[in-house]
Amino acid sequence: MTKLPGLALLLLLTACTIVEEVPDSLNTGSWQAHQASLQGMHHWFATGRAAINNGTESWHVNMLWLQQGNNYQIRLFGPFGAGQVQLTGNSDQVELLTSDNERFYSHNIDTLLYERTGVKMPVAELRYWLIGLPSPAGKDAASVDSHGRLSRLQQGEWRVRYKRYVSVNGLVLPGKIFADKKDLDVRVVIDEWKLGIQTLNNPFNDKG
């Protein structure tokens, strides 16, 4: 796999500890404290898998996601002719690179992915859902558990359910997320979280 210059991250990783789901309760203070800690997460790297079903077709993809502030790089492996696509961008523009080194550009990451691969996935929202926050793009109705973590979230047509949390470097982050709307079901499992700041090593090196 091609190594990607210029993207690097000081990785501070400890073993993930599973935190079991607990019943919902109204715990505003705990949620506000938990939300503040997540909003301070500007640099992270997640390795995981996603299953996507639109009622007639289904896809399974492996996923690598690097977030550095507003900049991201996402690699999806699986249903693209046994190849991969790479999405690189920020809040203004995104580039999609195919395994044939074709490059496509757009201002909408979800539309670009669908037009070039046929796969629908709420990538713009997942940036926030993956770490346990509502997307700021839409109105939401949320339920939190007794530890102040999201357990359920309604954003527009999307219903998001948090099925498992893991403890990473003192933060509690999602380990399994289900999201669905009328014509689409997306299930994401995070196998590994890496957190850190500043630049030293390319986190993709360990995966390539």
Residue ranges and their predicted role:
Residues 54-58, 79-82, 182-183:
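Solvent-exposed loop/turn segments connecting transmembrane beta-strands
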Residues 132-208:
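Gly/Pro-enriched, hydrophobic low-complexity segments
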Residues 17-20:
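Bacterial signal peptide processing site
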Residues 111-140, 144-147:
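Solvent-exposed helix/loop surface patches that form functional interfaces
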Residues 71-120:
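An acidic-aromatic
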Residues 34-55:
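A short, Trp-centered hydrophobic/proline-enriched beta-strand micro-motif
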Residues 12-15:
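C-terminal motif of bacterial Sec signal peptides marking the signal peptidase cleavage site
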Residues 2-10:
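Sec-dependent signal peptide recognition
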